[in-house]
């Protein structure tokens, strides 16, 4: 108990502590350089800590993970708290069209942001997808949301305390466990993930599925049974006739109910995949993970060939993190495309603002994760891997001659040469087609441009891939059912709004997809170059001694700068931004043009939001500027004085933030040196000398500041532009 109160006080919590930072950081802020060093090194437990044993680093990694969980719990608690006290969730369950849970208080007129969402409720329109998620979970009252908010808050406090406890208080046995990466065995984690997936399937089957079945049949949410009532067999037999015979029979009843795994297509009541399919998915994913984990634990890997890398990967935090980030990022991007192709949440597919927000959000997450994978792969190559030909490295590890890493480094020039060739070929041809179209259209020769009405470029391979699901089901379904029964094929309408439909692919899609290929390959080129040449290059053979980040390589080498692995990550983020900007722009315009819209029953025609203009106008660069960026920015530019004015202010402020970044990205260190010295001279002249001495930004620090503001400004601008447009269209 005495040990507990020794550490639970504000003095210890606010103290930097020599065991958590190196000597320079532990001294506190003497100059402004300390601030930048803190940003750069606070989470670099291997380098910034005075105690950097494997055990202490493991404890800090574990603690930071718990702290992250605390933030996630706090965020979830906030979402559920707002849903419980400030939302129209109960009304939304009866008429699921315009969710809102962010009531703005009037201080100097901010209440103009509260839009009329129906049912005498005014709020900001939310597009997070939480209402649809809660409905899928089986939450039907705002009291349930209060319970969830309280549970999330308890979880946040518990994980925050656990993070602090593991960071400051430790035992030798636990440190040894955390220092060993075998504690985070992939097989064990797979089994845990499988158990979690099956647990979630159990919740869906026993709670969510019965409640959603009653909601779909028109039962008022206030008349629904409580979740604990569903644990009794009598009520379940009313909802699912024949229930209660035995586990095997019960499971088959769930699967054979309308809307379970034997059905294809979307639930006509909700415009989403049947919940029974989703429960089956989680159940079988869980089984697969458990079997895979058991196999991974039982099978002893061979020591020959590629598995000689096992020691390097198993003993490196950065290699594990790099692989996990790449996988998680790829899964996030995959989920982004599932949101519109196969909507899994009730009433989400017809809520265009939510679909757009979730797509863009998960695309950005995936992009940043993948760039992070490149960053930590570079750090792994520098800190955790040895040198070629079996020579011991400074870290004391050996490099296997026949390993995958050795093979990659031996062939890195060939790999990069091919990547460079592919990138240049894609870029020249893809942009060349656009420039050709702009030029000939400007010269009044529309018959000579690439378009569906003149010189066609048909995406034959894409159309074939698009048809594969329907071809796969031809053996089980007959006639049109093979096509219309699959989400994304045929037409799915909910309350007069198009949820999914077949996308016509033509010349415009062929052109923009090659731009996607170019930008993705360019991003990969930069990140791969940073990884493969992180230890040495032709100009700088001793990169390994310079570390992960350094501004230039020193005198006598021709002034080669921007060659560090950090600089490759820096440039990779920009190209990732380019890649994803084109992806989300393409998605937003394509969906407005060819998918989203209103189905007119009398004429049996779809009135799309932009009238199918994508194939006509997106084949020129001028069309992207005129018909997409300028034309569709009308809502955000003209938002002042309306409920969308908040997006107008964000649009303006984010532009300023983006422009501010250019001052850091286009100026050298000399500019900052002169500026700081001038300001210092003025302060000394006036005898106003700060305690924390100003220092000019280094080259790397300036680039980092510019990068952060560029990303914040660009993403903020895009966010305001998209949401102002889609919310205005949704409400109107």
Swiss-Prot record:
Highest taxon listed in the record's lineage: Eukaryota
Pfam families referenced in this protein's UniProt entry, alphabetically: PsaA_PsaB
MF GO annotations: 4 iron, 4 sulfur cluster binding; chlorophyll binding; electron transfer activity; magnesium ion binding; oxidoreductase activity
Cofactor note: P700 is a chlorophyll a/chlorophyll a' dimer, A0 is one or more chlorophyll a, A1 is one or both phylloquinones and FX is a shared 4Fe-4S iron-sulfur center.
GO cellular component labels: chloroplast thylakoid membrane; photosystem I
EC annotation from Swiss-Prot or TrEMBL: 1.97.1.12
Major localisation: plastid
UniProt binding sites for chlorophyll a': 655
Record function comment: PsaA and PsaB bind P700, the primary electron donor of photosystem I (PSI), as well as the electron acceptors A0, A1 and FX. PSI is a plastocyanin/cytochrome c6-ferredoxin oxidoreductase, converting photonic excitation into a charge separation, which transfers an electron from the donor P700 chlorophyll pair to the spectroscopically characterized acceptors A0, A1, FX, FA and FB in turn. Oxidized P700 is reduced on the lumenal side of the thylakoid membrane by plastocyanin or cytochrome c6.
Gene Ontology biological process terms in this record: photosynthesis
Binding site for [4Fe-4S] cluster: 552, 561
Enzyme class: oxidoreductase
PROSITE patterns xrefs: PHOTOSYSTEM_I_PSAAB (PS00419)
Record localization: Plastid, Chloroplast thylakoid membrane
InterPro entries, per the entry: PSI_PsaA, PSI_PsaA/B, PSI_PsaA/B_CS, PSI_PsaA/B_sf
Entry keyword set: 4Fe-4S, Chlorophyll, Chloroplast, Chromophore, Electron transport, Iron, Iron-sulfur, Magnesium, Membrane, Metal-binding, Oxidoreductase, Photosynthesis, Photosystem I, Plastid, Thylakoid, Transmembrane, Transmembrane helix, Transport
Binding-site positions, phylloquinone: 672
Its membrane topology: Multi-pass membrane protein
Sites where the protein binds chlorophyll a: 663, 671
Protein name per the record: Photosystem I P700 chlorophyll a apoprotein A1
Disulfides per UniProt: none
Catalysis performed (reactions): reduced [plastocyanin] + hnu + oxidized [2Fe-2S]-[ferredoxin] = oxidized [plastocyanin] + reduced [2Fe-2S]-[ferredoxin]
Subunit composition and interactions: The PsaA/B heterodimer binds the P700 chlorophyll special pair and subsequent electron acceptors. PSI consists of a core antenna complex that captures photons, and an electron transfer chain that converts photonic excitation into a charge separation. The eukaryotic PSI reaction center is composed of at least 11 subunits.
